Amino acid sequence: MAGKLMRAVQYDGYGGGAAGLKHVEVPIPSPGKGEVLIKLEAISLNQLDWKLQNGMVRPFLPRKFPFIPATDVAGEVVRIGQDVKNFKPGDKVVAMLGSFGGGGLAEYGVASEKLTVHRPPEVSAAESSGLPIAGLTAHMALTQHIGLNLDKSGPHKNILITAASGGVGQYAVQLAKLGNTHVTATCGSRNFDLVKSLGADEVIDYKTPEGAALKSPSGKKYDAVIHCASPLPWSVFKPNLSKHGKVIDITPGPRVMLTSAMTKLTCSKKRLVTLLVVIKGEHLSYLVELMREGKLKTVIDSKFSLSKAEEAWAKSIDGHATGKIVVEP
């Protein structure tokens, strides 16, 4: 495909929001050693995508401009690089592109073989594209930070999941209920039925005084909180935690990181932990298998064509999507 062009969406610098996106034609990338070229069928947006555009980790990411954003994709392998052993052209796959290096809002993308997994015919491209960052963030929070076994074994845990109708929250509720848990979830009242259908035992409206205070309707103290919403002060979490309760914050800012450090330095029994997701192919493959078995699903808020990527971007920035926002080339 050398010399051939593809449609893509990129931005030329920090800031600008949806208006900063540009539709371009660029050369189709070539897979390097240990990489696969994927014809993209679905791209799932994450908050991280537009936060990078806003300069959240400048000057480290994006590494250079112009930059094609988005990393979580599903599609079909069309070409393999040197030393690729597990994939061949025609394979349907789910992948994370470029380890936060972007490239997703396009017709084709290159992924490392290590961050690519096979997608069975029972699992759609749109549904599986939500898994790499959002699904694995939920999985990592539950299994590594909380120590939950996803097979109903182990000690019972009371878990709170905030923003449970969002991209990460929806997966966290479903995965948590595979373990020995009682799950309390927060969301807006319009999403109560949805979140209950995902398995939540209790649902509270974050707009009510009780919801804002994270109070469990049954009066339970939380052994763990997976916080997927906007930052809250430690004083809101602390009284709701059990003796050794833990808060896992998936979108930590400077203040959250400071609080996390303080709870560690003071040897507090109640802890605030920040989570930076690590993408591993074996964990992604596990989530895809759960989907195939019908134990995990993706709630899709909306789908947009690549030509309307700005609308998808704006909706993601708005922050009120129910589930995942998907772009289809």
UniProtKB/Swiss-Prot annotation:
Expression is induced as follows: Up-regulated by 2,6-dimethoxy-p-benzoquinone (DMBQ), 5-hydroxy-1,4-naphthoquinone (juglone), 2,6-dimethylbenzoquinone and menadione. Up-regulated by host root contact.
InterPro entries, per this entry? ADH-like_N (IPR013154), Chloroplast_QOR (IPR052733), GroES-like_sf (IPR011032), NAD(P)-bd_dom_sf (IPR036291), PKS_ER (IPR020843)
Report the EC code(s) recorded for this entry: 1.6.5.5
What's an example of a GO molecular-function annotation for this chain? NADPH:quinone reductase activity
Q: Chief localization class?
A: plastid
Q: Name one GO cellular component term.
A: chloroplast outer membrane
Output the SMART domains linked to this UniProt entry: PKS_ER
The UniProt activity regulation field reads:
Inhibited by dicumarol.
State the UniProt keywords alphabetically: Chloroplast, Membrane, NADP, Oxidoreductase, Plastid, Plastid outer membrane
* Reaction(s) catalysed (UniProt annotation): 2 a quinone + NADPH + H(+) = 2 a 1,4-benzosemiquinone + NADP(+)
A Gene Ontology biological process noted in the UniProt record is: alkaloid metabolic process
Instruction: Return the similarity comment.
Output: Belongs to the zinc-containing alcohol dehydrogenase family. Quinone oxidoreductase subfamily.
Q: What is this protein called?
A: Quinone-oxidoreductase QR1, chloroplastic
